Amino acid sequence: LGEVDIKGIDATGSLSLQPWDKIRINLSGNYTYQRALDVTPPDPNTYESTYKHQIAYTPRVSASGQAGIETAWIDLSYSFLFSGKRYALGQNIAENRLDSYSDHSISANRDFQIRKITTSFSVEVLNLMDKNYEIVKYFPMPGRSVRATIKIRY
């Protein structure tokens, strides 16, 4: 891999609303389309060429989105990540293809103030749909997991 030609588009948006006095809704998302091709001149002595193939681990399409609700009592959020199919090596052949994947996660966060000590408690559910997927070939990502965090600030 020596030269790469990348063309594409990124679109990002966000919106924050406060429909009621103590409730805020935050929405955001982004979309990427990129055509990232290996344009290194092919070596005539090499049988296998990657010329004009999408470069490894670079999906043509990816997207993410977030939605959150902030209240005086608790903050809730949802996030979504999508990555289109991509290839583990420079040759865009079936053996190197990695399927597209999506990941959904949710979280809840609550802050407490006791005298001069602020405590935050959060719970997250990662990979909510418990989908099996690989970001890197032969290295599967964990299934559904729950993470709880307590932070104390004084």
Locate each region found by the language model.
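Hydrophobic, lipid-facing positions within transmembrane beta-strands of outer-membrane proteins
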Residues: 7-13, 61-65, 102-108, 144-150
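Outer-membrane beta-barrel domain signature
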Residues: 1-2, 50-56, 93-97, 135-139
